[in-house]
Regions:
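A generic structural signal for nonpolar/aromatic side chains embedded in well-ordered alpha-helices
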Residues: 43, 138-139, 159
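Hydrophobic, well-structured mid-protein blocks that either form specific transmembrane helices
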Residues: 117-154
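An active-site-proximal "capping" alpha-helix that borders the catalytic cofactor pocket
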Residues: 64-68, 108-124
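Short coil/turn segments at secondary-structure boundaries
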Residues: 55, 101-109, 126
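Short glycine/proline-rich turn/loop motifs
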Residues: 40-49
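Basic/hydrophobic alpha-helical interface regions
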Residues: 30-32
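Divalent metal-dependent phosphate-bond-processing catalytic cores, especially two-metal-ion Mg2+/Mn2+ enzymes
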Residues: 2-26, 49-77, 87, 97, ...
Length: 268
């Protein structure tokens, strides 16, 4: 397969993210309670400092907040997952080198630093002691599976689902794909690995995506099945979209990818 032009795709993703951010904001904000709106307002004031965010963070937070609202509605989860997902990544403010955000040490640091920061913001915006306690419980463990520690508790697993579904959104999937040269050379291999991370041994995508023992071993540390039915349905739909895009070769053609990105991003 032809190699992906990383230098062409990444700017398209960043450009699309800017418009998508505001589209998401219009969709999400009216559905929030006053306290949650205050949390989001506080966060976006922080994001005015470019050193405090990665270019995709506004889209990630808004998209995952939208998903949290859906889980609260359809899976009857604790509404505090909304506050939790809004604040879950503020510990990254403490990382000077954002390029190393996915390292295990950074995962640990951002949970440790994010928990006390979130406590102050929650108290400042009218959350009770019990609500703060529950929300901090979610934030303090939300990336535990990436460091080999399982998460327990329905609300905490709900927040984990909200956070993790983002990686199959086209903005996140393709920014991860082009983040490393070796992935650009073998994009289907990257998609196959991610499929294994979400489904383990069994998935619904056909024999061409056969899961081997070697692939399971390779991805063992990242294998984590979604908790809730709403999440499972969304993830399956996103994999179907990413597979079709691979089959169509869209990411190999800058013009085609630009048009597809513009048309698709709003319905992700």
């Amino acid at each position: 397969m032809k190699e992906i032009n990383r230098g062409a795709i990444l700017p398209l993703l960043k450009e699309a993210a800017e418009a998508y951010w505001h589209q998401l904001e219009e969709q999400v904000t009216p559905k929030l309670g006053e306290r949650e709106k205050s949390l989001l307002d506080w966060l976006f004031v922080q994001y005015q400092d470019e050193d405090k965010k990665r270019w995709y963070d506004p889209c990630h937070i808004l998209f995952s907040t939208k998903f949290a609202l859906e889980l609260v509605d359809k899976e009857n989860l604790d509404p505090l997952i909304v506050a939790g997902i809004i604040l879950h990544d503020i510990g990254y403010f403490a990382l000077k080198d954002k390029s190393q955000w996915s390292a295990k040490e950074s995962r640990i640091t951002h949970m440790q630093e994010g928990t006390p920061r979130a406590a102050k913001v929650l108290y400042d915006n009218g959350f009770t002691s019990l609500e703060v306690e529950k929300t901090l419980g979610m934030i303090s463990v939300h990336d535990n599976p990436y460091i080999g520690i399982p998460i327990q508790g329905e609300a905490r697993l709900g927040l984990r689902d909200c956070d993790r579904v983002w990686v199959m959104h086209m903005l996140s999937f393709y920014k991860d794909l082009v983040s490393r040269p070796e992935r650009c050379k073998k994009p289907r291999e990257f998609l196959h690995d991610r499929m294994t991370q979400f489904y383990g041994w069994e998935h619904p995508f056909g024999a061409q995506w056969k899961v081997t023992l070697n692939r399971v071993v390779k991805n063992a540390e990242r294998i984590e099945l979604p908790r809730y039915d709403v999440t499972k349905e969304y993830v399956t739909k996103q994999f179907e979209r990413r597979i079709q895009e691979m089959d169509d070769g869209l990411v190999l053609d800058e013009d085609k990818f630009r048009k597809h990105l513009k048309n698709q991003i709003g319905i992700e």
